[in-house]
């Protein structure tokens, strides 16, 4: 398995993986919207993505955004983590998380957050999986407003 940081030329494969992820999880963004956003995402210095390859074929992806706040300074969020169903339980997700965390450390992030939806937790036991990687529940809730 090879894991590397996505380049602008990887926007297509990244978008294809994320489109599958969004469709599986029932997220609203269409494949066309995801493809368009991949170019923008990869052009932003505060963002990055990692791709995992098995035998030269994309097997998974992770996306990371960073910001800066008064409470913790530089911080990051792992926005998306997806591994193709046939490639799961082989360490691909763990490798992507390790690469993302290393990048966050290099950028000087004080902490890294991940949002686990109730559906994702019920389907994939994500809360326990992330806790096993050292993530803790903060007790904070995320409220969102569409603009």
State what each model feature region is:
Residues 109, 130-140:
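Conserved acetyl-CoA-binding loop of GNAT-fold acetyltransferases
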Residues 5-73, 79, 97-98, 103, ...:
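Acetyl-CoA-dependent GNAT
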Residues 90, 107-110:
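Short coil/turn segments at alpha/beta junctions that flank glycine-rich nucleotide-binding fingerprints
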Residues 1-2:
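Extreme N-terminal starter segment of soluble prokaryotic enzymes
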Residues 113-126, 147:
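Conserved beta-strand-loop-alpha-helix junction that forms the acyl-donor binding cleft
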Residues 87, 91-99:
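Conserved acetyl-CoA pyrophosphate-binding loop and the N-cap/start of the following alpha-helix
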Residues 78-85:
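Mid-chain, well-packed structural core segment of small domains
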